[in-house]
UniProtKB/Swiss-Prot annotation:
The gene is mutM. It holds the Pfam family Fapy_DNA_glyco. A zinc finger (FPG-type) spans 241-275. This is Formamidopyrimidine-DNA glycosylase. Its cofactor is Zn(2+). The keyword Ribosomal protein does not apply. It catalyses: Hydrolysis of DNA containing ring-opened 7-methylguanine residues, releasing 2,6-diamino-4-hydroxy-5-(N-methyl)formamidopyrimidine; 2'-deoxyribonucleotide-(2'-deoxyribose 5'-phosphate)-2'-deoxyribonucleotide-DNA = a 3'-end 2'-deoxyribonucleotide-(2,3-dehydro-2,3-deoxyribose 5'-phosphate)-DNA + a 5'-end 5'-phospho-2'-deoxyribonucleoside-DNA + H(+). One of its GO terms (biological process) is base-excision repair. Keywords: DNA damage, DNA repair, DNA-binding, Glycosidase, Hydrolase, Lyase, Metal-binding, Multifunctional enzyme, Zinc, Zinc-finger. Its EC number is 3.2.2.23, 4.2.99.18. It comes from Leptothrix cholodnii (strain ATCC 51168 / LMG 8142 / SP-6) (Leptothrix discophora (strain SP-6)). The lineage of its organism: Bacteria, Pseudomonadati, Pseudomonadota, Betaproteobacteria, Burkholderiales. GO terms for molecular function: 8-oxo-7,8-dihydroguanine DNA N-glycosylase activity; class I DNA-(apurinic or apyrimidinic site) endonuclease activity; damaged DNA binding; zinc ion binding. It comes from the Bacteria. The active site is at residues 2-3, 56, 265. DNA binds at residues 94, 112, 156.
């Protein structure tokens, strides 16, 4: 699933190319996860503002002249990607949405069809407010601190990895990045979340930021389907310390990396470097 790094890489690849463009048409293919919530023809002639990201969502504000006209909230689902080109090839069976502008076309490709694009009157109202209202803090912003994490973990008996994946304390730290950050912080993913001390929370905050920044520099991770706005795959998975390295030597100590299942998701960790 595209997580924060993949979504941010996508946004960065689009922001200067599509910002300021004028919508000509919105073409819909097979129904996606949610109805779009607006008649596509109503978007024609509207201008696209500066793209923003919240968690794993991309917000595309629209203007009708000088008047705000809501915006489109894009979600890549389990396997989606957005690509923008002046001239795209003919759509294939997994291409479900195409936003045609005076600069080119933006296409949502999603083999598993869990992705979505929905119209909302603003980020603070309508479906955007419902989808984003329960999200935690952004991990790369100043609001994500050890004290915020420590407070959010209080009373949580679930494993720390599952607490991070929930997204209501901190957003966008997906499965691969949870495994990697817990390794960097030296924390066993099975440890009860409520048992993390403030000092270990500080290490974990720094580890999450380190791993996410490395992933951004690498263009995200492409385990199967993800491509950025230029059609290129990410490379972070090639430098992973533990993720998808079961029964291989830990790059730090040489012990064999273990694989377990937590909440139906694969977890990878070093039994020597990561302590409870």
């Amino acid at each position: 699933m595209p997580e924060l790094p993949e979504v941010e890489v996508t946004r960065l690849g689009l922001v200067d190319r599509i910002g300021g463009a004028t919508v000509r048409a919105l073409q819909l293919g097979k129904p996606l996860r949610w109805p779009i919530g607006v008649a596509p023809q109503q978007l024609a002639g509207q201008r696209i503002g500066e793209l923003a990201r919240r968690g794993k969502y991309i917000w595309m504000p629209l203007q009708d002249g000088s008047t705000p006209a809501g915006g489109l909230l894009w979600h890549l689902g389990m396997s989606g990607s957005l690509r923008f080109e002046a001239q795209l090839p003919p759509p294939g069976p997994h291409d479900h949405v195409e936003l045609v502008t005076d600069r080119g076309s933006l296409r949502l490709t999603d083999p598993r069809r869990f992705g979505a694009v929905v119209w909302s009157p603003s980020l603070q109202a309508g479906c955007a407010a419902r989808l984003l209202g329960g999200l935690g803090v952004e991990p790369l912003e100043d609001g994500f601190t050890a004290s915020v994490l420590h407070q959010g973990l209080r009373g949580r008996r679930v494993a720390i990895k599952q607490a991070l994946l929930a997204g209501d304390i901190v957003v966008g730290v997906g499965n691969i990045y949870c495994s990697e950050a817990l390794f960097v912080a030296g924390i066993d993913p099975r440890l009860a979340a409520q048992r993390l001390s403030l000092a270990r929370c500080e290490r974990l905050v720094q580890a999450i930021r380190q791993v996410l920044r490395q992933a951004l520099m690498a263009g995200g991770s492409t385990l199967r389907d993800f491509r950025d706005a230029h059609g290129m795959g990410g490379a972070f998975q090639l430098q992973a310390q533990v993720y998808d390295r079961a029964d291989q030597p830990c790059r730090r100590c040489g012990a064999l990396v273990r694989r377990i299942v937590q909440g139906q998701r694969a977890t990878y960790f070093c039994p020597v470097c990561q302590r409870r």
